[in-house]
């Protein structure tokens, strides 16, 4: 049984990682967090402080990081030196050359090329890639446009609690991303990560991101132009056969919450141009984050692609 660590165990994603590891039969799990949360317990397990010494001690085989980019940059190298495979959820390493950015059902073989770190993609890039990959294989991709509707939990446990505590009439979440030139950094991430995952470095991808007053579950409206003709009926068949994707007449965040599949529907011709329009929803804490990271680790540990 591998010896596992979860850094950021008290956060929104970290807690889901801990729960999913238990569901999947992993019981040698140590929990780490900041000094502020150290000493608390999760499901009877003591939370330790995530220090360089603790992470580099050489007694962890896999370490899941669900912390901010600054903390990941500081702590991940120590765990790597200790011999652990580090699966990092932050943006710190995603676009770095030589570090695989992996969705197991899409480009799982890349995880086996790791040198101690595998990056876990953005919570919108994961479901988008899962839907685009089968369309890419069927007809090629010419261009992608996406509008995201992202839940409060995507910003973390504090943002989620704020939503749950405030009166419904005050649910008007402002944009909480930083500008990167003329677009949000989140929009840049989706474009660059999707290109890297699909191995299409020149693919035109345009994203518009919106934060919405939903607790859990991200939704995305997607417009796809393919290289070869692809009608809605055939696209529906292709997506129905894709791993970790389920065709649903009208996907919603509520329907996706608590599940491990990407729901995709509204598959139809794009009336404003060539291509297709579709809508998807995904639990951003599970397949959009925690589950994808665990599947990466399972893939590397087994040295074979994970089953959907």
Give a label for each model feature.
Residues 206-211, 216-308:
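C-terminal active-site/capping subdomain that shapes the small-molecule cofactor and substrate pocket
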Residues 172-215, 221:
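Oxyanion-binding "anion nests"
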Residues 8, 12, 70, 123-130, ...:
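Conserved active-site and cofactor/substrate-binding residues in soluble primary-metabolism enzymes
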Residues 1-175, 203-204, 256-263, 267-272, ...:
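N-terminal Rossmann-like NAD(P) cofactor-binding subdomain of oxidoreductases
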Residues 25-28, 179-187, 239-243:
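A broad, low-specificity signal for short, low-complexity segments enriched in glycine/proline
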């Amino acid at each position: 049984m591998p010896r596992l660590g979860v850094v950021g165990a008290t956060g929104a994603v970290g807690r889901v990682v801990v729960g999913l590891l238990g569901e999947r039969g992993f019981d040698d799990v140590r929990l780490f967090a900041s000094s502020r949360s150290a000493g608390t317990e999760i499901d009877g397990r003591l939370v330790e402080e995530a220090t360089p010494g603790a992470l580099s001690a050489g007694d962890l085989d896999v370490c899941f990081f669900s912390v901010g980019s600054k903390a990941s940059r500081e702590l991940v190298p120590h765990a790597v030196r200790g011999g652990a495979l580090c699966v990092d959820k932050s943006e710190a390493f995603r676009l770095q050359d030589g570090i695989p950015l992996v969705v197991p059902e899409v480009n799982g073989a890349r995880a086996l090329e790791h040198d101690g770190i595998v990056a876990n993609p953005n919570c919108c890039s994961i479901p988008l890639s899962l839907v685009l990959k089968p369309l890419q294989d069927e007809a090629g991709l010419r261009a992608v446009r996406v509008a995201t509707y992202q839940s409060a939990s995507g910003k973390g446990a504090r943002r989620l609690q704020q939503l749950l505590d405030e009166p419904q009439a005050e649910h008007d979440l402002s944009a909480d991303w930083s500008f990167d030139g003329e677009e949000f950094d989140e929009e840049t991430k989706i474009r660059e990560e999707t290109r890297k995952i699909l191995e299409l470095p020149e693919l035109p991808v345009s994203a518009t991101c919106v934060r919405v007053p939903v607790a859990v579950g991200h939704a995305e409206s997607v417009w796809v132009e393919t290289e070869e003709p692809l009608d809605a009926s055939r696209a529906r068949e292709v997506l129905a056969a894709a791993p970790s994707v389920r065709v649903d007449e009208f996907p919603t965040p509520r329907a996706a919450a608590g599940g491990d599949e990407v729901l995709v529907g509204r598959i139809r011709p794009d009336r404003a141009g060539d291509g297709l329009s579709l809508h998807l929803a995904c639990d951003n804490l599970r397949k959009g984050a925690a589950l994808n990271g665990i599947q990466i680790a399972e893939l590397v540990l087994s040295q074979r692609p994970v089953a959907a």
